[in-house]
């Protein structure tokens, strides 16, 4: 069984002693001293110990994870010993977060290189590569030719890379693996990642040190086991960094909830007054459609206060360029208010926020804390948040969540177990890479926390299903792998195996999206649901990214539109999923 230990804080002078002079000079030019998470984490990572660091948002967890790794790579770079391989993998559940880390990792490295030039110290170039769903084909090809030393990616992209011989060769001696925002993986994406981490272990000739970063969650022991897996020879240290941050959280009712006559007007008047009282406000809704609706209403109800230069919508259906532009404008203080669904919940750096508004119940105290942590992102600042409730159910839920937050009670995370759909997908991906002995495959899967108690019969049922032992031809479901019961081996079947795998990877609910482009410039704006498009006719006006567009025509998988400013939307809203209520709540 996996052994768990409690981390102990180390002295600042002990950490300083292991830092390369360039890294030390850079660090103390930015920070006065080591933060609490750094005193718990840096030395353990340097000593190659698996560690889970749990601390509130804004407590420098990410830098804690990277500091020892950057230090190690700078030492190798000075000795001209950097090889063309991946030394560290950083995986996060958000594409936006990966982009942010990429940016914030490159900048410290560039500053360290400038210091080296001033001191006439020659350093090899430390390469950082970003591989997500947004990465272009050209960038992927460039990465395949020359491996990055630090790979920033998502769980799904990492699984894809582990089916590619070139990248598996680059990962043969990977030394570090950072799993950020681990609390956001208490779902089938987490289950998927748990096997991907075991695949990474199998691909590497050495054990990749696991570094887990999490907001304040419980139970930490189970999360730590999820990080390193289940085996007698595995150990993990837990750094539960308790940092008491001042919290100012209130539940505000929008008008009279008994007489629900004119709540819309009351809601936007209340929002406007709260926004005006603060410098920068971040508003969370629970769906993309609500995000668009709020931005549109604020623009129409208060046209002199809110325009494209002061307010923006942010969600996953916007184009990469639009998302990055909004994040940058928010970070630099150019926007007064940003409305988002869940896309800015996690630890992406968005600059100074002094108020977080949560429209309706966030459905769990853990999510509410994560959202609240965006306000006063630095530790010494007060996190100020307001729940705006629109009905009595919301009032009860938000009241309970507020009480849990004030009492420091955290919703427990639960990782699903023995998900056979995820298992089928992972086995298929592994068979694409190479021929496996089924007993070795079963042992690898059993090391995953989420499959440590997987019945052998269930495993072989999945193998039989993938091998086509079930008569499913009438449903156009055919064998994906071959299985030889005599030799106990499996492998891929068919020339289209990789294409099938790549086009069906992951556990994020499938949505059929159509790209929205401006006419005649062909500039991508975002994407809309196919079902939403079916309801539109030529000339309809809809909202995307807080801006209004007139639908012109559809060509292939693209919708062509032109911007409008004086017309109101003619089609109500588009579709997106609601958030689930947490089990504890």
What are these regions (language model features)?
Residues 2-15, 22-25, 39-40, 46-52, ...:
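Helicase motor core with emphasis on the C-terminal RecA-like subdomain
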Residues 62:
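Walker A/P-loop
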Residues 21-35:
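N-terminal pre-Walker A segment at the start of P-loop NTPase domains
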Residues 474-584:
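Conserved nucleotide-binding/hydrolysis modules and their immediate coupling elements
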